[in-house]
């Protein structure tokens, strides 16, 4: 189960929290869920170059509070706060309620799974060799304190005729251990050969109460190649 299920959904009742935090009755739920999806798509489009890791949406009493976690908060805020005011007005138009925006800085983007996946996707779009991009990302993550990392790429890697899946792992990535703090991220690289999907799992330690166990000695990197048909080229 741990190998197939989404790592966040598997750990929601143990250590992870929801990205949308509000309550709605059965009549209002579809509209509010649709609004959340539109907000995330709007922010993803507007902040494509701001290295956004996570967006948390809360709805207290006829208001909305949106927290954006970014490795480049200066790009989100803009000169003298102009960009963030433009974002706020756009979000208020989408949601129909007053919106409060908070910007949180991601201090270690090298061990953030979403930012790692997006970085690899950008490199693949610039025709960097996928193995080089994956290994460089793994080395940076292990150097900055990750206990383990696994990166998977799927599609027409290096422009080959038949799509395949290739992954590398360094250290431990215990997906079935509920107390393991696993960060997970996905991205798509739109290359001239088609879409290449990237998935990243980062193991940051085991959670005991509010404490995370520190990193142990890293293991040797592991590589595995699995060939698949073209219909499995891209990952979601």
From Swiss-Prot:
Residues 215-236 are annotated as: Disordered. Gene3D superfamilies: 3.30.300.20, Ribosomal protein S3, C-terminal domain. Residues 39-107 form the KH type-2 domain. GO terms for molecular function: mRNA binding; rRNA binding; structural constituent of ribosome. One of its GO terms (biological process) is translation. Keywords: Ribonucleoprotein, Ribosomal protein, RNA-binding, rRNA-binding. One of its GO terms (cellular component) is cytosolic small ribosomal subunit. InterPro entries: KH_dom, KH_dom-like_a/b, KH_dom_type_2, KH_sf_prok-type, Ribosomal_S3_C_sf, Ribosomal_uS3_bac-typ, Ribosomal_uS3_C, Ribosomal_uS3_CS. It holds the Pfam family Ribosomal_S3_C. It comes from the Bacteria. The keyword Thylakoid does not apply. Part of the 30S ribosomal subunit. Forms a tight complex with proteins S10 and S14. Belongs to the universal ribosomal protein uS3 family. Binds the lower part of the 30S subunit head. Binds mRNA in the 70S ribosome, positioning it for translation. This is Small ribosomal subunit protein uS3. It comes from Methylobacillus flagellatus (strain ATCC 51484 / DSM 6875 / VKM B-1610 / KT). The lineage of its organism: Bacteria, Pseudomonadati, Pseudomonadota, Betaproteobacteria, Nitrosomonadales.
């Amino acid at each position: 189960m741990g190998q197939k299920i989404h790592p966040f959904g598997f750990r929601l009742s143990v250590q992870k929290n929801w990205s949308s935090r509000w309550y709605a009755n059965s009549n209002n739920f579809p509209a509010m869920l649709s609004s959340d999806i539109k907000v995330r798509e709007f922010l993803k489009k507007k902040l494509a170059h701001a290295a956004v890791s996570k967006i948390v949406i809360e709805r207290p009493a006829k208001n909305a509070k949106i927290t954006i976690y970014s490795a480049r908060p200066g790009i989100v805020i803009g000169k003298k706060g102009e960009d963030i005011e433009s974002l706020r007005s756009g979000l208020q138009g989408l949601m129909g309620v007053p919106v409060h925006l908070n910007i949180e800085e991601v201090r270690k983007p090298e061990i953030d799974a979403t930012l790692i996946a997006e970085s690899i996707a950008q490199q693949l779009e610039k025709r960097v060799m996928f193995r080089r991009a994956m290994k460089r990302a793994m080395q940076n993550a292990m150097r900055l304190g990750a206990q383990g990392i696994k990166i998977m790429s799927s599609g027409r890697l290096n422009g080959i005729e038949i799509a395949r899946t290739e992954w590398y792992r360094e250290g431990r990535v215990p997906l079935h251990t509920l107390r393991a703090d696993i960060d997970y991220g996905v991205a798509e690289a739109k290359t001239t050969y088609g879409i290449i999907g990237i998935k990243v799992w980062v193991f940051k330690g085991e959670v005991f109460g509010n404490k995370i166990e520190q990193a142990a000695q890293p293991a040797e990197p592991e590589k595995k190649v699995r060939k698949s048909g073209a219909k499995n080229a891209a990952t979601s």
